[in-house]
UniProtKB/Swiss-Prot annotation:
<dbReference type="InterPro" id="IPR020567">
    <property type="entry name" value="Nodulation_prot_NodA_CS"/>
</dbReference>
<keyword id="KW-0963">Cytoplasm</keyword>
<keyword id="KW-0012">Acyltransferase</keyword>
<protein>
    <recommendedName>
        <fullName>Nodulation protein A</fullName>
        <ecNumber>2.3.1.-</ecNumber>
    </recommendedName>
</protein>
<keyword id="KW-0808">Transferase</keyword>
<comment type="function">
    <text>N-acyltransferase required for nodulation. Acts in the production of a small, heat-stable compound (Nod) that stimulates mitosis in various plant protoplasts.</text>
</comment>
<comment type="similarity">
    <text>Belongs to the NodA family.</text>
</comment>
<dbReference type="InterPro" id="IPR003484">
    <property type="entry name" value="NodA"/>
</dbReference>
<dbReference type="GO" id="GO:0016746">
    <property type="term" value="F:acyltransferase activity"/>
</dbReference>
<dbReference type="InterPro" id="IPR016181">
    <property type="entry name" value="Acyl_CoA_acyltransferase"/>
</dbReference>
<keyword id="KW-0536">Nodulation</keyword>
<dbReference type="GO" id="GO:0005829">
    <property type="term" value="C:cytosol"/>
</dbReference>
<dbReference type="Pfam" id="PF02474">
    <property type="entry name" value="NodA"/>
</dbReference>
Length: 210
């Protein structure tokens, strides 16, 4: 899960009134992509220039392209974003349909617009799509932060010690086409319980990260 978030972000700020919008990818116009690309550059830039590079121009996605987005707007424009893409992943030889969640970001000037708030909007959409699980990956360093935001609230289960194999977003002559990462897996039970999540310590995305 591409994620840009302040470590102090836990509760919604009283300084901003955010309106949430659920958008299918085909509903977005060029102006929407341009606004989102600018938002991502400003959100991911502080985490490293490399993380902002995919959003040059008006490109509003980094790896795989989402099919649905939850976008938070306030008086200053885009305030927060999370994307969704349905796909099959493979765990221990089992093919599993999931809704991958990624492209999560909060505008740097907003403290406290936590992922739990965007998930309150996204969760009903996951239920309508009929997926068994929502799925995402983050850096292990964010485990304590995600535990505060979604783990303790019962929104998700965090699974450390998992390796995820993905493809690069593009083909590069000087890089392997495959990426293998040790990440923290975040699972949102939707149509099934966590007891039905397949056992395994390696997940194949068979495609690029969202």
């Amino acid at each position: 899960m591409n994620i840009a978030v302040s470590p102090s972000a836990e509760e919604p700020s009283a300084r901003t009134q955010v309106q949430w919008s659920l958008r299918w990818e085909s509903e977005l116009q060029l102006a929407d992509h341009a606004e989102l690309a600018d938002f991502f550059r400003k959100s991911y830039g502080p985490t490293g220039a490399f993380n902002a590079q995919p959003f040059e121009g008006i490109r509003s996605w980094a790896g795989a392209r989402p099919e649905m987005r939850v976008i938070g707007y306030d008086a200053h424009g885009v305030a927060a974003h999370i994307g969704l893409l349905r796909r099959f992943i493979k765990i221990g030889g089992v093919d599993l349909l999931v809704a991958e969640l990624g492209l999560y970001a909060v505008r740097p000037d907003l403290e406290g617009l936590g992922i739990s708030h965007s998930m309150r909007v996204m969760y009903p959409a996951l239920q309508e799509l009929g997926v068994p699980f929502g799925f995402g990956t983050v850096r292990p360093a964010l485990e304590k932060h995600l535990t505060r935001l979604v783990g303790r609230r019962g929104l998700a289960t965090l699974m450390p010690g998992i390796r995820v194999r993905s493809t690069q977003a593009d083909v590069y002559p000087n890089l392997s086409p495959i990426r293998i990462e040790d990440v923290l897996v975040v699972v949102f039970p939707v149509g099934r319980s966590m007891g039905e999540w397949p056992a395994g310590t390696i997940i194949d995305r068979n495609g690029p990260e969202l």
